[in-house]
Structure formats: C-alpha cells, structure tokens
Amino acid sequence: IALTFPLSNNFKAINYKNILYAILVMFLFAFILLNNFVNQFFEAISNGVAKLSSATAEGTSFLFGSLFESHPYVFALNVLPLIIVMSCLSALLWHWRILPLIIKGLSYVCEKLFNLGGPVSFGAAANVFVGQVEAPLFVRPYLQNMSKKELLILMTAGMATISGSVMIALAGQLENQFADLNVVRHFLTASMLSVPAAIMYAEIMYPSNDVTNTINTETDEKIYKGSMDAITKGTRDGLNIAVNVAAILIAVLALVSIVDGVLGLISANLSLQSILGYVFAPICWLMGIPWNEAIGAGELLGIKLATNEFVAYIQFGSLDPDVFSEKTKVIMLYALCGFANFSSVGILISGIGAMAEN
C-alpha cells in the first residue's frame, strides 16, 4: 500500500476512511470464505466443477473421438473446451438473472462502504465472475461519463481477478500441486478479495468524489433476447476467448523460447525465467515466502507478468510437488490469480476505448 502513495495524483485528497474500509472488508471476506462453516458451500461448488468438467469431456469426446480419448490431458482438448462451456453457462445464468443477483449483492456493499456509483460498483463486482472486457460491457452506457478513478477501479478489478471460466479451466492444471485442496475455493476467495483491493488502490492513485448516475438494472440486465440467444452468444464469446488464449499461448511461448535462445548465447545458465526470478524474489519474500524458495516463486511471478496467468499456472502445475512448501504453494496460488500482465493492459485499453471513444 505504501508503495502506491508516490503514484497518487493528489496525495492530499486521499480518503483514508475508504482505505481502512477496504482493508476491513478484505479481512471480513477472508474470514467468511476461509472459515469451516462455508465448507459445504465450497464442497458443492467443487462437485459442480467436477460435473461440469465431466460434461465438457463428453462433448469434446464426441467431437474429437479417439484423439481426445488418447490424449485427455492435452491443453487444447481439456482446458479450451471448458472455457467455451463455462462462457455459455455464464450467459445462461445471466439471462436467468442468477448472476446479476449475486453481483448486485457485492455492488451494494461497494456503494454503501466506499461511496461509489452503481455502475462502477456493478462493473467491479462483475469481474469476480466474468472477464476483464465483459465486465465493462455490462455498464457500457455509463463508461463515457465515468471519472478517471472509476475507470481505474474497473480496470484494476479486471486485472486483479480471473473469470469463472478461466478459474475452472485452471483448477485442473493444478491437481499435481494441490491434491487435497479445493483450488476453486481459493480462486474465488482471491477474486473476491481483489475487488475491495482494487477500489483501495484506485482511491490512492486517483482520489475523487465524482459519482456516476445510478445504474438502471431493469434495462441493463437484458443483454439476451431468450435462453437460446444466451446459449449461442455465450458459446460464441467463449470460442473467441478460447481461440485468443490458444493464439496468445503459442505466440508468447515461442517468444520466450526465442529470448531464451538469445540469452543462451551469452551464458548457458541464463534465461528469461532466471532473470525474472531474481527481480521478483524480494517481492515474494515480502509476501511471506522463505528466501530459499523466493527465487523459484519469483520466476513464476515474473513469467505471469511478462506473459499471462495461463503460462504461469501451467508451469506451476508442471513442477515437482516437493519444490515448494505447502505454505508457499498456497501463497503462489493467490499471487498468480489475476489477469494482470502487459497484454491485459492492451486488451483493456482497446476494449474500453472501443466502448467509450472519448
């Protein structure tokens, strides 16, 4: 938090009450979501994820036949179809007004505690379940009138969280590291904690009392004309996301390999991963990771920032389970949870720029 203060555009206008509220809300969310009395809720979510993965496998098996049956854990056949199915399901839940109901509850807390307008609260809360570009779409009519602080809240919340479809897709990649841990539970907790955190950092960097008009939820929720429209549009959006993820992974991994090849000419032991490990090791140590594990953890954090969370989590999942202690593995599960990377900045600028050209 202290590192953010020099970046503020108006240090004297910072509302310290909002910062205190944000920290208290994060502690409250963490206490509720990590307490034993919600175990049954997360157990139900875990079972739902297993059923969803199984159902997706049925569809993938029908389409690819023996290719999928011979290679069920190939990324393109395992993770990408899950993104498509989850996107379709999210659209359907939105049309049935189940997701808006949950999001409204979160946005109500943001409105009352942080004196935020309905649109930005709604958009920030939506990031817990949908992607960084989809969330601003829900409040598109209000974007052109939002203050810099409100836009920063939307963008920061988008980069600090991961969508429900990506959340479930990544959970399967980490089974090697967390055999007895409900990964989806921690992904959901990390995303929910990131919403008040995003508001806090925006309050520090762009303090402002400007509030947009109250959102008209009755009209703005009607994105789809019917259930079939939600299914088809949700599937199409999921396909676009899956194709983008696949394309970015191919390009990014190829570029990393090229950079490593060039660095290898200088020294056989030199690589982009090793450089990033030393750069981010102090940050990992500050997060509570022992110094003897900080360089390895820093490599993952650096890879996530330079490439994306998919590359980082895939690399994390491929490590030997004994490389990190249990504490370090859980810390890294939270630290890597978010769309924050250089490509996301471009995605957000182009996405929000297209929705509100001014």
Model-predicted segments: where are they?
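Alpha-helical membrane segments and immediately flanking helix-loop junctions
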Residues: 113-174, 297-358
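Long, contiguous bundles of hydrophobic transmembrane helices that form the permeation core
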Residues: 192-241
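Hydrophobic alpha-helical hairpins/lids featuring a short glycine-rich hinge
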Residues: 55-116
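Juxtamembrane inter-helical linkers in multi-pass membrane proteins
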Residues: 103-138, 211-230, 272-278, 300-305
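Hydrophobic mid-bilayer segments of alpha-helices in multi-pass membrane transport proteins
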Residues: 1-2, 16-32, 80-88, 188-198, ...
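Interfacial/capping segments of alpha-helical transmembrane domains
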Residues: 15, 19, 31-63, 212-214, ...
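Short amphipathic alpha-helical coupling elements at transmembrane boundaries
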Residues: 44-54, 101-115, 127, 141-144, ...
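Transmembrane helical segments that form the transport core of multi-pass membrane transport proteins
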Residues: 236-321
